[in-house]
Amino acid sequence: EIGSGLVGSEMCIRDRCCEVIYNPLTVLPKGRGKKEYRRILAVGRFSFGHKGFDILIKAFSVFVKTHPDWTLEIVGEGPEEALYRSLINEYELEKSIALHPFTKEVQEYYAHSSMYVLSSRWEGFGLVMIEAMAHGLPVIASDLPITRELLKDKDMAVLFETGNIAQLAGCMSYMADRTDWEWMGNKAVEYADTFHIEKVCDSWNNLLKKVVYGTR
């Protein structure tokens, strides 16, 4: 689960000799998110620093002051859960933020949310963003090499400076206040479809033909 830039730089491969095929979408959508839910979603392991959920909670504490009817749902498990719960208590957000354990039915969370936030400090790929877009959710993501590669110039996504709490809060307000949600949702679903497993398999077949028959 890594992007093309990481493959090329880590393995010292020239661009013309390298072809990256992204991981396929394995979580198939079961419904579609709506703005009316007023719910922000994040999914990932509660590991030390990685997913940046501490950043997200702090940013949400700023955002919710102007959007009090919105909630934040974080799905995951791991060693930082106690830290996140202490932050929720510190900001008195027990009624606005909920932590949920991992579930095989994560589609239910996607389908009943309004936007997705990837607050990671680093990321190899971030398939959860694609899963969210498959459910019609606009995405806010840390400005990382892979998110820039996947989301740059995409109308249903916005990037914020990694770790910048104020900027993330501003991005959440920007998304929450937009009026073109149906259009953004359509764009998100359309883009996520390019990661459908059949299309990824086609990419692999084409690449193998190039290698075997020398048609590169």
Language model features: what each stretch is:
Residues 1-13:
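Single conserved hydrophobic/aromatic residue that forms the stacking wall/gate
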Residues 24:
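Carbohydrate-associated surface elements
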Residues 33-51, 57-60:
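Conserved donor-binding/catalytic core segment of Leloir-type glycosyltransferases
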Residues 53-98:
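A conserved nucleotide-sugar
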Residues 102, 121:
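Aromatic "clamp/platform" in nucleotide-sugar-dependent glycosyltransferases that forms part
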Residues 138-141:
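Short hydrophobic beta-strand element within catalytic cores of glycosyltransferases
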Residues 153-154, 158-165, 174-179:
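Conserved acidic donor-binding segment of nucleotide-sugar-dependent glycosyltransferases
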Residues 167, 180-194, 206:
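A short, well-ordered alpha-helix in the C-terminal region of glycosyltransferases
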